[in-house]
C-alpha cells in the first residue's frame, strides 16, 4: 500500500494560484489505494520492475512525487476558503484514456457541525429611584463546551440577581453561581437539570453563609448600617441555553419570559409569600405570612425564596424551581428581568416592545409598500455585522460583545419601567434565540 498523489503522467506538480485552492482540493485529494486498483496492469508491471531490479527506485520516485504535490498546495488560503466542507464521495480519476471509479476515499479532514453559536444578547441595568444599586447581572456565553466526533455544542449562561438588604450577596452570586453550574454540568453526564440546579443553588447559599461569617461581618456596608449580615439576600433567575433546550432556574421574584411566535410564555413563576403552595409550605415549617405593605414572611421579606436571608430559614429557602423547555424554530427571544420591570410592565407588553425593536433592526418592521434601493440595501447589509461589534459595548473580562439591537431593546424596557414609576432597581437581559448555524472543517 502506498500513499500517492495520482495525476496525469505528463503533468508536473507546480504551484497553483490562490483562487484555485478549492478546485485543487476537490480535484486532487489524498487517497489510499493499491497499485492494482489504479491500473489493471500494475501487477504485471511490478513483476517486470522486480525482474529489472528497479522496484524500490520506482516506489521512492512515487513517494517523492507525492511529497512535491503536497508541498505545492496553497498555504495562504483565507479562512473562508479553509471553511469549505469537502463532502464529495464519488471521485473519478483519469489517466489518459482510462478512468478508475469505485475508489476508496479516506478524507484527511472531518466535517464538524458547530451548532448554536454565541447568541446575540443585550443588557441594561439602572438604579432607578432607589438610593443604592443592589442588582447584578451575569453574562457568560459558551461557558460550557462539549464536543463529539462530528459536532460541537455550546451552552450559554445568563443570570439576573436582585439583592435586598445590601448588594454583596447579589455580587457574590454574579461571581460564583455560573461556576457552580458549570461544575455540576460537567460532572453530570445524564444532564438531569433539576438536580443540577438544585445542587448549584444549595452550594451557592452555603458559600454565602460562610463568606458572610469570614469576610463581610467586619466591613458590612448594609443599607441599615448594621453588622448583622444575616439580613442580606438575593433573588436569582438563571437561564442555560443549549442547542435543544432552554433551562430556567428561579429563586425569588425575578422572572424569565420567552417570546414564541409573538406570544409571551413565562418560564418561571414568582415566589410570593401569598402564593397558595408557598403559603402552605411556610406554615408547615412553622412560619407566618403577615400583610405589611403586601404579603411578607414574618412581616419582613416580600418573597418566599431567596439565596441568603439566614435569619428567616427554614421559612425562606434557596431551592429553585426549574423548568426545561424544548427549543423550536418559533422561539424569538428570552427576557430575564428583576421585579423592578415586572411590577409595572406585563409580560405581553414587554414582549411586544422587544419584538418591534428587533424586527425593526432586522428590516422586518418596514412599512407596507416601502421599498429599499439596491444601494441602500447593500449599505445596510454591509453595516449589519459592523454594528454588532463596533456599535455594541463590551461586557466582562473576556471582552464579550453585546448586540446593538438587543441592547437597545433592554434599554427601552428600563425606560418604560421608569416611565411607569417603578420604585426599584431595574435590570433587563434580552437574548435573541433565532438560530444561526455554521458549518466548517476542523
From Swiss-Prot:
<protein>
    <recommendedName>
        <fullName>Protein phosphatase 2C 3</fullName>
        <ecNumber>3.1.3.16</ecNumber>
    </recommendedName>
</protein>
<comment type="subunit">
    <text>Part of a K(+)-channel calcium-sensing kinase/phosphatase complex composed by a calcium sensor CBL (CBL1, CBL2, CBL3 or CBL9), a kinase CIPK (CIPK6, CIPK16 or CIPK23), a phosphatase PP2C (AIP1) and a K(+)-channel (AKT1). Interacts with AKT1 and CIPK23. Interacts with PYL8/RCAR3 in an abscisic acid-independent. Interacts with PYR1/RCAR11 in an abscisic acid-dependent manner.</text>
</comment>
<feature type="region of interest" description="Disordered">
    <location>
        <begin position="363"/>
        <end position="401"/>
    </location>
</feature>
<feature type="binding site">
    <location>
        <position position="424"/>
    </location>
    <ligand>
        <name>Mn(2+) 2</name>
    </ligand>
</feature>
<feature type="binding site">
    <location>
        <position position="162"/>
    </location>
    <ligand>
        <name>Mn(2+) 2</name>
    </ligand>
</feature>
<comment type="similarity">
    <text>Belongs to the PP2C family.</text>
</comment>
<dbReference type="GO" id="GO:0048838">
    <property type="term" value="P:release of seed from dormancy"/>
</dbReference>
<dbReference type="GO" id="GO:0010030">
    <property type="term" value="P:positive regulation of seed germination"/>
</dbReference>
<comment type="function">
    <text>Involved in the negative regulation of the K(+) potassium channel AKT1 by its dephosphorylation, antagonistically to CIPK proteins (e.g. CIPK23). Functions as a positive regulator of abscisic acid-mediated cell signaling during seedling growth. Involved in the regulation of seed dormancy. Acts as a negative regulator of seed dormancy by inhibiting abscisic signaling and subsequently activating gibberellic acid signaling.</text>
</comment>
<dbReference type="GO" id="GO:0046872">
    <property type="term" value="F:metal ion binding"/>
</dbReference>
<keyword id="KW-0460">Magnesium</keyword>
<keyword id="KW-0341">Growth regulation</keyword>
<dbReference type="GO" id="GO:0004722">
    <property type="term" value="F:protein serine/threonine phosphatase activity"/>
</dbReference>
<dbReference type="InterPro" id="IPR001932">
    <property type="entry name" value="PPM-type_phosphatase-like_dom"/>
</dbReference>
<dbReference type="InterPro" id="IPR036457">
    <property type="entry name" value="PPM-type-like_dom_sf"/>
</dbReference>
<dbReference type="GO" id="GO:0005737">
    <property type="term" value="C:cytoplasm"/>
</dbReference>
<feature type="binding site">
    <location>
        <position position="162"/>
    </location>
    <ligand>
        <name>Mn(2+) 1</name>
    </ligand>
</feature>
<feature type="region of interest" description="Disordered">
    <location>
        <begin position="30"/>
        <end position="100"/>
    </location>
</feature>
<feature type="compositionally biased region" description="Acidic residues">
    <location>
        <begin position="79"/>
        <end position="90"/>
    </location>
</feature>
<feature type="binding site">
    <location>
        <position position="339"/>
    </location>
    <ligand>
        <name>Mn(2+) 2</name>
    </ligand>
</feature>
<dbReference type="GO" id="GO:0005886">
    <property type="term" value="C:plasma membrane"/>
</dbReference>
<dbReference type="GO" id="GO:0005634">
    <property type="term" value="C:nucleus"/>
</dbReference>
<dbReference type="GO" id="GO:1902039">
    <property type="term" value="P:negative regulation of seed dormancy process"/>
</dbReference>
<keyword id="KW-0464">Manganese</keyword>
<keyword id="KW-0539">Nucleus</keyword>
<feature type="compositionally biased region" description="Basic and acidic residues">
    <location>
        <begin position="376"/>
        <end position="390"/>
    </location>
</feature>
<keyword id="KW-0963">Cytoplasm</keyword>
<keyword id="KW-0378">Hydrolase</keyword>
<feature type="domain" description="PPM-type phosphatase">
    <location>
        <begin position="120"/>
        <end position="433"/>
    </location>
</feature>
<dbReference type="GO" id="GO:0009788">
    <property type="term" value="P:negative regulation of abscisic acid-activated signaling pathway"/>
</dbReference>
<keyword id="KW-0904">Protein phosphatase</keyword>
<keyword id="KW-0479">Metal-binding</keyword>
<dbReference type="Pfam" id="PF00481">
    <property type="entry name" value="PP2C"/>
</dbReference>
<keyword id="KW-0472">Membrane</keyword>
<dbReference type="GO" id="GO:0009939">
    <property type="term" value="P:positive regulation of gibberellic acid mediated signaling pathway"/>
</dbReference>
<keyword id="KW-1003">Cell membrane</keyword>
<dbReference type="InterPro" id="IPR000222">
    <property type="entry name" value="PP2C_BS"/>
</dbReference>
<dbReference type="InterPro" id="IPR015655">
    <property type="entry name" value="PP2C"/>
</dbReference>
<feature type="binding site">
    <location>
        <position position="163"/>
    </location>
    <ligand>
        <name>Mn(2+) 1</name>
    </ligand>
</feature>
